[in-house]
Curated annotation (Swiss-Prot):
Residues 1-14 have a biased composition (Acidic residues). GO terms for molecular function: microtubule binding. The lineage of its organism: Eukaryota, Metazoa, Chordata, Craniata, Vertebrata. It is linked to Hepatocellular carcinoma: A primary malignant neoplasm of epithelial liver cells. The major risk factors for HCC are chronic hepatitis B virus (HBV) infection, chronic hepatitis C virus (HCV) infection, prolonged dietary aflatoxin exposure, alcoholic cirrhosis, and cirrhosis due to other causes. Residues 533-556, 701-710, 759-776, 797-815, 1244-1270 have a biased composition (Polar residues). The gene is MTUS1. This is Microtubule-associated tumor suppressor 1.
């Protein structure tokens, strides 16, 4: 009770605490008014390092339709590689979608981006720890691991703060417990971004992830599709106001509304496979495949602009995040947006995106959605509903461990009251510009009612698919989403199990506390807790469970809350009273259920039992429960529990018990009549519990179911439906989701994949098988419930109450069926689990305790976390002890006693189990209440401390203001004085200037006169001096002329004398030369005469000789003539002579030729010698060449060998580098987790298990390069 009150108070306080306008300005704001709250965004910053410390920053951004963002950094939260990859994938898809969305609603993007991006992503990241991780390494590796245990955890944590944004997004704090498990799952795919961007309430989307909401949506999917289509129209009408992702908000919002429902639901399964509208269809085309892949993103962004709008918000948020987290946040935001969109759609009318979902989602879902069923039948049905309604459940189912499903209901949250509802200002697109005040065209209560109805319908549908797995349209769409999520979640679940590995505080103390409380009080408190949270949650269909509960508990109070949060806080304070009042206002049935949750369960059960019996009969007659039967059952339940039916989660809870009972009854009939009786008792108890839980289990159980708490409600409903005979399905899913809690994360992973396969092959058997694997270890069911709780962390109210209610229901159910059923479940997983129902209940109990522990770990604010741990641990210990004893007793009883006694013993055991379950539930509720109260106390203390600081600052500032005013007065007087002095100085200055001018003129005149006189004086003196100098120069010139004349005469006289001397010397030398010349002439003439005489003699001699020769010539000529005459007489002789001469010429020619030939021969000989030498050299070179070739061959062989060796070494090096990179990445991740807080450290064991899973990949990848070396 205190926890719920604290939640509501915190919601109110937070809402009032911060409000952010479109511009992103934060101001104190009381989000009582639903319209503003719609756009309000709340951020909860939880330091993972200090789980006890929780800072809740509540920001209401009317402009920003994206919901509140909760930043939760929990030590318990563990980030996984899958989460990272999931976020990456989301980032890519969401970024793309964001881009589209941004274009559609840039104002929204701009507004929300800076503010919410960090909050949403950071909150989820902080909450999940994975979100934080994504911000670091997380940046969400695209498509790598969309399903991440970390995400689930983060979602759970977020859901822990699942502020039921009834009026304000503040409810996230109140929904600590619920939001925890489901929020985690939701967050798994889009927790951070979707949260914020989607439906203004990141937390909301996380909460919505709960299986309750999924279930409700599932059922609603069938008939709400029309509603959803109508909401599509409504969004266009109130698009700016209500549908963030609606046609008006988004350009293609109208189509988007239905698509959002479907695709948000599917989106978890296939991130973008469902983009109906063209704007996001291309994204769908791209991401649809990815989504079909386990897309943790969760919400598949419908083609419609609305989804894009959500993504836009998500994108904005992610954009505002600076680091890798931004990408992660984009993804997360995308997820959140998608989830939010789906949730919003669900929440609005929860028209359940069913129409679009069935259209596109169904196609994809058939192939892979079965896998989701494999993961958990309940999960599958949830997934179906969720797929139809919102992929949150699927995210929880598929990727509850690591997948962040929260984003789906993020949008819903924003709507406060089904923010998604057409009335809500969920305008994520352009409508963001319009003030959020206008957003709430429909009252939060109406929106909540719509959402609840839709969720109820969805829940029914979801349950129907679970039990039936036949409704192809609903089941397949949800399955598709679930399948994708399941595929991803299998790994994520294992990791999620790691989240449960938190150190548990002393259980004894918690037990003592729980024991001190009255049983009914805790339940009422839990119900009230759950109810307030559901109310808040009902504000947003993502937190459909919480919002539904809110609506169920106080639809009118919701409007009251919107009108006056303070009144709501007061109501919360008087938790039981208000809860009763709320129930009264909403429905007397709801009040009765919440008050008489434990005792009234049988009463309600009787009414519901008949319906459930009918449903069970129908299910027994038809293994796949027909949608009609399920709907009929829901209608009956609605008649029995009108309020419950209004609150979708109540319907879901009721319907789930029916389905559970159906499958258990079937198996009970198969096994024995006793099992049938037990099942009937269980059904009665479960009906009561579910009716009772519908309020607080409605949201919580839905959240739990959606987030992966298939054991509590999901197990009861979805698991029991599909795996009721094989009750182990629920536990395995929970275990898988809570692999962080489980000791065998890898085993759980293995189980979850198997389960997924089985689900794809056959919904129930697969889920049962998975449950069996999970059931092998009872602690795992606890982890699973913990995981479930984690996933509804934001929907903490729903999750914890749902745990309590589910626990009580399951306890009742298990009590009816008997402890032997638990043993049977363990021994015979398929039948015993839900046959007896005790095992299911029992299983839920451990899960609940662990879920509580996990919720306590994750959601508690401040010391409340430790208390939660202690309480949950104590509960779990007692639960574990009880289960063992129960198991032992059933085994011994049937052996020792006859059948009748065995039946009696089983009945007594079932009663004991019911009582113990109620006790455990009450303890859990007490622990949850304590935790919530402590969280509220921490928040209040924080707010009070801040208020005191603000008051101190106000005082100091006021004093400073007074001082400044005094100083201002003094300064003003001083300024006036200075002004006067300045004026005086100005006048003096002007007078001085005039005087100066006058003096200047006078002095100039005087100076002119003075200088003129001086000038004249100087001129006269200058003239006088010039004349003097002229006279002096003239005298000097005359003197110089006289001296020159005298020197000239002297020089002329000396020159004449010299000339005479020279003439005499010349004449003497000339006479001498003439004499010498004459002598030489005479000698030469003598020589000439002599030579002439000698030459004449020679001439005479030669003439005589010439004559003699002439004579000889004549005689010779005569002789020749004579010979010629003789030759003429002998011609032969002449011929011979000629021949002789010719022969001589020929001989000469021949000789020349021979000489040339000799020369040539010499040359040839030389060439031959040279040739032989060259030949020898050639041979030598050839031999050398051959040797070199041989050596070259050897070298080539060696080089080839070396190259091959080098390639092998290079491959080995690459492998080692890859291994080193992986190890380094894992090491960084582990270090980051260690750095983020102790909560993540317990999850290391699952992380270690994840490492071995990756090592096989490395080992497998290594051989491939070795096989084909480069």
């Amino acid at each position: 009770m205190t926890d719920d009150n604290s939640d509501d108070k915190i919601e109110d306080e937070l809402q009032t605490f911060f409000t952010s306008d479109k511009d992103g300005n934060t101001h104190a704001y009381n989000p009582k008014s639903p319209p503003t709250q719609n756009s309000s965004a709340s951020s909860v910053n939880w330091n993972s390092a200090n789980p006890d410390d929780m800072v809740v920053d509540y920001e209401t951004d009317p402009a920003v339709v994206t919901g509140e963002n909760i930043s939760l950094s929990l030590q318990g939260v563990e980030v996984f590689g899958h989460e990272k990859s999931s976020s990456d994938f989301i980032s890519k898809q969401v970024l793309d979608m964001h881009k589209d969305s941004i274009c559609q609603c840039p104002a929204l993007v701009g507004t929300e981006k800076p503010k919410y991006l960090q909050h949403s992503c950071h909150s989820l990241e902080a909450v999940e720890g994975q979100s934080v991780e994504p911000s670091l390494p997380f940046v969400w590796k695209p498509n790598d691991n969309l399903n991440c245990a970390g995400y689930c955890d983060a979602l759970e944590l977020n859901q822990t703060f699942d502020m039921t944004v009834d009026k304000v997004n503040c409810t996230f704090i109140s929904h600590h417990a619920i939001g925890k498990s489901q929020s985690f799952h939701t967050a798994g795919s889009l927790p951070p971004t979707g949260r914020r961007s989607g439906s203004t309430s990141s937390l909301s989307y996380s909460t919505w992830t709960s299986s309750h909401s999924d279930k409700t949506h599932a059922r609603e999917t069938t008939y709400d599709r029309e509603s959803f289509e109508n909401p599509q129209v409504t969004p266009s009408e109130a698009q700016d106001m209500t549908y963030t992702a609606f046609s008006d908000v988004v350009m293609q919002s109208e189509v988007f509304v239905s698509d959002i429902g479907n695709q948000c639901a599917c989106s978890s399964g296939k991130v973008t496979s469902e983009y109906t509208d063209g704007s996001q269809q291309r994204l769908v085309g791209e991401k649809e495949t990815q989504a079909l892949t386990p897309v943790s993103d969760g919400m598949e962004v419908p083609n419609d602009s609305a989804l894009q709008e959500f993504f836009c918000l998500s994108h904005d948020e992610s954009n505002s995040e600076p680091h890798s987290q931004s990408s992660y946040r984009h993804k997360e935001m995308g997820q959140n947006l998608r989830e939010t969109v789906s949730y919003c759609l669900i929440d609005d009318e929860c028209p359940l995106m069913v129409p679009a979902f069935d259209k596109s989602e169904a196609q994809v879902l058939n192939p892979e959605h079965k896998v989701t069923e494999t993961e958990d039948t309940q999960m599958v049905s949830k997934g179906k509903d969720l797929g139809t309604q919102n992929h949150t459940s699927e995210l929880i189912l598929s990727s509850p461990p690591g997948q962040k499903v929260g984003s789906s209901f993020g949008l819903t949250w924003d709507a406060n009251d089904m923010v998604i509802s057409t009335d809500k200002t969920m305008c994520m697109s352009t409508p963001v510009l319009e003030p959020t005040k206008v957003t709430f065209s429909v009252s939060p209560i109406e929106a909540t009612e719509k959402c609840k109805k839709v969720e109820k319908g969805n829940r029914g549908l979801k349950n129907i698919p679970d039990s039936k797995e036949a409704p192809v349209n609903l089941c397949k769409p949800s399955l598709g989403k679930s399948t994708i999520k399941t595929n991803t979640p299998i790994g994520c679940k294992v990791r999620k199990t790691e989240i449960i590995s938190y150190p548990r505080p002393n259980f004894k103390n918690v037990k003592a506390k729980v024991m001190s409380r009255a049983v009914l009080q805790p339940k009422d408190a839990a119900l009230s807790k759950v109810t307030p949270r559901p109310q808040q949650t009902s504000a947003s269909s993502p937190s459909s469970v919480n919002s539904r509960q809110q609506t169920v508990l106080s639809r009118t109070p919701r409007s009251d809350l919107n009108a006056d949060k303070k009144a709501e806080i007061l109501i919360n304070k008087t938790h039981k009273q208000q809860f009763n009042k709320l129930i009264t206002s909403q429905a007397v049935h709801v009040t009765t259920h919440s008050k008489n949750a434990s005792h009234r369960v049988p009463r309600t059960t009787s009414a519901v039992k008949s319906n459930q019996e009918d449903v069970d009969k129908a299910s027994s007659s038809n293994s796949a429960c027909e949608t009609g039967s399920v709907s009929a059952l829901f209608q009956k339940i609605k008649g029995i529990l009108p309020v419950k039916m209004e609150s979708a989660e109540c319907l879901e809870m009721t319907y789930v018990p029916n389905i559970d009972r159906i499958s258990p009854e079937k198996k009970g009939e198969k096994e024995n009549g006793t099992s049938m009786e037990k099942q009937e008792l269980k059904q009665e108890i479960m009906n009561e519990t579910f009716e009772y839980g519908s309020l607080f289990l409605g949201s919580a159980s839905k959240t739990t179911t959606t987030s992966g708490r298939n054991i509590s409600k999901p197990d009861s409903c979805g698991l029991r439906q599909i795996a009721a005979p094989k009750a182990k399905v629920g536990p395995p899913v929970s275990c898988l989701r809570r692999n962080s809690d489980n000791r065998n994360p890898s085993a759980d992973r293995a189980v979850s994949p198997q389960r997924i396969r089985r689900v794809s092959s056959s919904g129930k058997p697969t889920s049962l098988k998975t449950a069996q694997s999970s059931w092998v270890n009872l602690p795992r069911p606890l982890p699973k419930s913990k995981a479930s709780l984690k996933s509804p962390a934001l929907r903490r109210t729903g999750s914890t109450p749902s745990i309590a209610s589910t626990h009580s229901e399951l306890s009742t159910y298990s009590n009816n069926s008997g402890n032997a059923a638990v043993i049977k479940y363990e021994e015979k997983p398929p039948k015993p689990a839900f046959q007896n129902g005790s095992s299911g209940s029992f299983y839920l109990k451990p899960l609940v305790s662990r879920a509580h522990v996990h919720l306590m770990k994750t959601p508690p604010k401040g010391p409340s976390r430790k208390n939660l741990f202690t309480a949950l641990n104590a509960v779990e210990k007692s639960r574990q002890k009880n289960p063992r004893s129960l198991c032992i007793q059933p085994q011994t009883a049937p052996d020792a006693l006859p059948p009748e006694k065995t039946l009696e013993l089983t009945q007594y055991k079932t009663k004991c189990e019911n009582q113990s379950g109620f006790i455990l539930q009450l303890k859990q509720l007490l622990a949850c209440g304590n935790t919530k109260f402590e969280a509220l106390t921490v928040v209040i203390q924080h707010l009070l401390s801040e208020r005191e600081e603000a008051l101190k600052q106000h005082k100091t500032l006021s004093q400073e203001l007074v001082n400044l005013r005094g100083e201002l007065v003094t300064a003003s007087t001083t300024c006036e004085k200075l002004e006067k002095a300045r004026n005086e100085l100005q006048t003096v200055y002007e007078a001085f200037v005039q005087q100066h001018q006058a003096e200047k003129t006078e002095r100039e005149n005087r100076l002119k006169e003075f200088y003129t006189r001086e000038y004249e004086k100087l001129r006269d003196t200058y003239i006088e001096e010039a004349e003097k100098y002229k006279m002096q120069l003239q005298e000097q010139f005359d003197n110089l002329n006289a001296a020159h004349e005298t020197s000239k005469l002297e020089i002329e006289a000396s020159h004449s004398e010299k000339l005479e001397l020279l003439k005499k010397a010349y004449e003497a030398s000339l006479s001498e030369i003439k004499k010498g010349h004459e002598i030489e002439k005479k000698s030469l003439e003598d020589l000439l005469s002599e030579k002439q005489e000698s030459l004449e003699k020679q001439i005479n001699d030669l003439k005589s000789e010439n004559d003699a020769l002439n004579e000889k010539l004549k005689s010779e000529e005569q002789k020749r003539r004579a010979r010629e005459k003789a030759n003429l007489k002998n011609p032969q002789i002449m011929y011979l002579e000629q021949e002789l001469e010719s022969l001589k010429a020929v001989l000469e020619i021949k000789n020349e030729k021979l000489h040339q030939q000799d020369i040539k021969l010499m040359k040839m000989e030389k060439l031959v010698d040279n040739n032989t030498a060259l030949v020898d050299k050639l041979k030598r070179f050839q031999q050398e060449n051959e040797e070199l070739k041989a050596r070259m061959d050897k070298h080539m062989a060696i080089s080839r060998q070396l190259s091959t060796e080098q390639a092998v070494l290079q491959e080995s090096l690459e492998k080692e580098s890859k291994v080193n990179k992986r190890l380094s990445m894992e090491n960084e991740e582990l270090l980051w987790k260690l750095h983020n807080g102790d909560l993540c450290s317990p999850k290391r064991s699952p992380t270690s298990s994840a490492i071995p899973l990756q090592s096989p990949r490395n080992s497998g990848s290594f051989p491939s390069p070795s096989i084909s070396p480069r």
